[in-house]
Regions:
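Helix-to-loop junctions at the C-terminal end of transmembrane segments
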Residues: 72-84, 276-290
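Residue-level signature of mid-helix packing/kink "hotspots" within the transmembrane helices
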Residues: 66-74, 124, 157-158, 270-278, ...
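Short amphipathic helix-loop junctions that connect adjacent transmembrane helices
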Residues: 39-55, 245-261
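C-terminal transmembrane helical hairpin of 12-TM major facilitator-type secondary transporters
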Residues: 291-334
Length: 350
């Protein structure tokens, strides 16, 4: 790794306080996202009584969300490389709040689709959060720090879906209002507490190529050692997005679960993820390299995903969640490998 990738003295380096700030911000962010997962398919179902149409429209809702995130992620990353991480993160928190309130007030499927486009674009600031962590962390500690960030994701999934399931039992739209309030809280937290991580001397100008998703992929592919990881990253992203997109529909139709039961199942997913990434990951990395951990994690996740598809009873889902401990480290391991190949001014694009 080049010297440019090292955190700048006096502005970067190991900054535990800044790490705590971004961890809280990410926790609130994913708590808000987790709130809506158990109830979003049912909200789509309010606009159509046909189960086949509900599934199709939910697929479009998920697709537009993911497409917006794909397009927006490099744009937000490039903007954060130019103007700093903090303003881009604040923009994302504001956009998420508007998205949640718009979804809660949607009166048609088209309004729901439009609000999810905004949500997908703003949720892309998760990439900026990763860049923030890279800015404030020495290279040798990044895998562990990315694991802590993943633990915040897990805790958000511990609390969010359970709260969403319980609130959804009162009213399907209530979780969206609560999620919007949390996003506003995150915005206020960021305005008054969150420090900037990228000093002015390490920023660079924004170019159209940097904001182009395909150009960003090509730039990543040119980084030493990352080109071979690109197919792996694509497959992992596709698998994870597909799993969480169909989770509620799958368990509802196969096991007859409602919002509360789905909330508890996602609670289990988040608990295991937080335990592994927040407590066990540092110990695991003392035994194996990030490269070897990535291979082990991918194998574990592959077996688990096949198991979900073959499960015939609801309790089997919980057993598979418990067995897939290593699978929860795949994101931190791969992100560490990619981040280690990028210079300090390119972290927003990783």
């Amino acid at each position: 790794m080049s010297a440019a990738a090292e955190p700048a003295a006096g502005t970067g380096g190991d900054r535990p306080a800044a790490m705590r700030f971004i961890m809280v911000a990410v926790l609130i962010d994913f708590l808000a996202v987790g709130l809506i997962i158990p109830v979003l398919p049912a909200l789509v179902g309010q606009f159509t009584a046909n189960p086949a149409e509900q599934t199709r429209w939910y697929g479009w809702v998920a697709f537009t969300y993911a497409a917006a995130s794909f397009v927006a992620a490099p744009m937000l990353g490039a903007l954060s490389d130019r103007y700093g991480r903090r303003p881009v993160l604040l923009l994302g928190f504001c956009g998420l709040a508007l998205n949640f309130f718009a979804t809660a007030l949607a009166t048609s499927l088209w309004m729901l689709l439009a609000s999810r486009v905004v949500g997908g674009a703003m949720q892309a600031n998760a990439a900026v959060a990763n860049a923030y962590v890279a800015d404030i962390t020495p290279p040798e500690q990044r895998a562990r720090r990315f694991g802590l960030l993943g633990a915040m994701f897990g805790i958000g999934f511990i609390l969010g879906p359970v709260m969403g399931g319980l609130l959804g039992g009162i009213d399907l739209r209530l979780p969206f209002f609560v999620a919007g309030a949390l996003a506003l809280l995150n915005l206020l937290y960021g305005v008054f507490v969150l420090p900037e991580s990228l000093p002015a001397e390490r920023r660079r100008n924004v170019t159209w190529s940097a904001a182009n998703p395909l150009s960003s992929l090509r730039a990543l592919a040119r980084l030493k050692g990352v080109g071979l990881l690109m197919p792996v990253l694509a497959c992992v992203g596709l698998a994870q997005f597909t799993l969480y997109t169909v989770w509620v529909l799958y368990t509802t139709f196969k096991f007859g679960w409602g919002p509360t039961q789905n909330g508890w199942s996602l609670f289990a997913v988040g608990t295991v993820a937080a335990l592994v990434q927040g407590v066990l990951l540092g110990r695991i990395l003392k035994l194996v390299t990030p490269q070897r951990l990535a291979v082990l994690a991918l194998c574990s996740a592959m077996v688990a995903n096949i198991g979900y598809g073959l499960a015939t009873e609801g309790w089997m889902i919980y057993a598979i969640i418990l067995m897939n401990l290593l699978g929860n480290t795949v994101g931190a391991a791969l992100q560490s490998l990619v981040s280690g190949a990028a210079s300090g001014s390119e972290q927003g694009q990783t």
